[in-house]
Amino acid sequence: MTTMTAERAPRIGMVSLGCPKALTDSELILTQLSAEGYETSKTFQGADLVIVNTCGFIDDAVKESLDTIGEALAENGKVIVTGCLGARTGADGGNMVRQLHPSVLAVTGPQATQQVLDAVHRNLPKPHDPFIDLVPGGMGIAGLKLTPRHYAYLKISEGCNHRCTFCIIPTLRGALVSRPIGAVLNEARALFAGGVKELLVISQDSSAYGVDMQYRTGFWDGQPLKTRLLELVQALGALAEPYGAWVRLHYVYPYPSVDALIPLMAQGRVLPYLDVPLQHSHPEVLRRMKRPASGERNLERIQRWREVCPEIVIRSSFIVGFPGETQAEFEHLLDFLRAARIDRVGCFAYSDVSGAVANDLPGMLPMPLRQERRARFMAVAEALSSAKLQRRVGATMQVLIDAAPGLGRKGGVGRSYADAPEIDGAVHLLPPEKISKTLKVGEFTQARIVGVRGHDLLAQPI
């Protein structure tokens, strides 16, 4: 651990694990600490104190979080734990983190910014009060970001009103709480003004935005605006247009209200991309999961979306081997996948999540069978994806550049509208043919698709 001197500000190390929602919590914590005069450290050894924002949803995430806490304690010694794992109980009913790592300075659950700040202040007094606008260039409202400068996550709500039997998120993060629409749009405007070229809208359930407020009318720039996803997306599209920026929607449940968003995608006002967590297709499995929609309605809805916007890309996640899943129910899922032609897929073999109702459902399947079904599912999904990628060869696409070595003369890596960062594929860019052409991170380029490389595309910048 570094010894702090009077000549420099105290330094905070931050590790953010888990989903983009947790990442935005980490950004909020760091924004406030930076406003108070704390500096950040990229290493445990260079920090005076380390904050670990944990994930506690599935067993692998719990292990990663606990291992990271142990590593931070070993290399630094002063550790504050926050996030979903901080709200989990151990075998004896006590706090899991406290049981396994009793030397941590403090433990909080998710969305506990003030508690984390209080713990930091107790253990590493703040150098000054936050009387300044934090980031130049219009970014003060948006705060610090842990993503690359050209894209950012915009969290529109917290918590979830669903009680899916495989999930403990409502226990960890509570019921749905939507952000005021004016606050969301102010942050979006600041992000665009600060150079963000892609805004990724996230929450636990984006389709339900405003339900807890009964869609009441808010105000933004002196104009009335209903707190509802349609109005929010319309306003985000209008904000993005002058900057030529993208708006990408995540965690959108297939409610009837989502149908109104598809014409906006067809008109080019937001990206024709939807992240829709379907989880399964068979009505009986969805009933056991307590999911809010049926597989038949989902298939019909996706088909209607494609009629309105043929270019739409659908990403989804699925669970196979759920308790009681029969062979016929699994085959139903494979048939659904083929019929729906899902573009991007994530699939998990069901695993116990401590505290989830599904753990006590009858018909728990052997893990080898769950893994076998996942492998079969992914084989079908990858064949569908490969065929769709092959059809893009010869097309010209807009690509947002994420990496450009050699001053932009050696090619690079970017993404098309069909690719969300970290979870989807990429577009590998060849070196520009024109001497005058260079690639720059955070800027767009037109590229001609010349080949397919696994889940990715190969393209020649134009």
UniProtKB/Swiss-Prot annotation:
Protein species of origin: Verminephrobacter eiseniae (strain EF01-2)
InterPro entries named among the record's database cross-references: Elp3/MiaA/NifB-like_rSAM, Methylthiotransferase, Methylthiotransferase_CS, Methylthiotransferase_N, Methylthiotransferase_N_sf, NA-bd_OB-fold, Ribosomal_uS12_MeSTrfase_RimO, rSAM
S-S bridge residues: none
Name of the protein this chain belongs to: Ribosomal protein uS12 methylthiotransferase RimO
One GO MF term attached to the UniProt entry: metal ion binding
DNA-binding among keywords: no
UniProt lineage: Bacteria, Pseudomonadati, Pseudomonadota, Betaproteobacteria, Burkholderiales
Key words, A-Z: 4Fe-4S, Cytoplasm, Iron, Iron-sulfur, Metal-binding, S-adenosyl-L-methionine, Transferase
Domain Radical SAM core: from-to ranges: 146-388
Gene coding for it: rimO
